[in-house]
Design a protein with these regions (language model features):
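N-terminal amphipathic alpha-helix/helix-capping segment at the start of soluble metabolic enzymes
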Residues: 1-22
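A short, Lys/Arg-enriched amphipathic alpha-helix followed by its capping loop at the start of a domain
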Residues: 37-43
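N-terminal active-site wall of soluble small-molecule enzyme domains
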Residues: 8, 30, 53-94
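Glycine-rich, proline-tolerant flexible connector loops at the mouths of alpha/beta enzymes
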Residues: 22, 43-60
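Hydrophobic faces of well-ordered beta-strands that scaffold small-molecule active sites
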Residues: 19-24, 45-48, 77-83
């Protein structure tokens, strides 16, 4: 399933009266584990990244990892920049 937007995910959650888990991931292994757990629970999931993770790699690399894993997922997955450190980084994430 392709990535969904956080807006879509949160609107569905509001309509369905449920919460969505949001988890920080720093590498491919963490992304895979988070999605696997979400699939076991049959729950949508928000994967978050931080400025320090983006600094270590790149936003494009992290987006590629999450996109590839979301495409194989059986539950909705979205990507969120947690605590963006600058306007420029926030705009890049959009």
């Amino acid at each position: 399933m392709p990535l969904v937007t956080s807006k879509e995910m949160l609107l569905d959650a509001q309509k369905g009266n449920y919460a969505v888990g949001a988890f920080n991931a720093e590498n491919m292994e963490m992304v895979k584990a988070i999605i696997q757990a979400a699939e076991e629970l049959k729950a949508p999931v928000m994967i978050q990244t931080t400025p320090s993770t983006v600094k270590y790699g790149t936003l494009e690399t992290f987006f590629g990892i999450v996109s590839a894993e979301a495409a194989k997922a059986t539950v909705p997955v979205c990507l969120h920049l947690d605590h963006g450190s600058s306007f420029e980084l926030a705009m890049q994430a959009i």
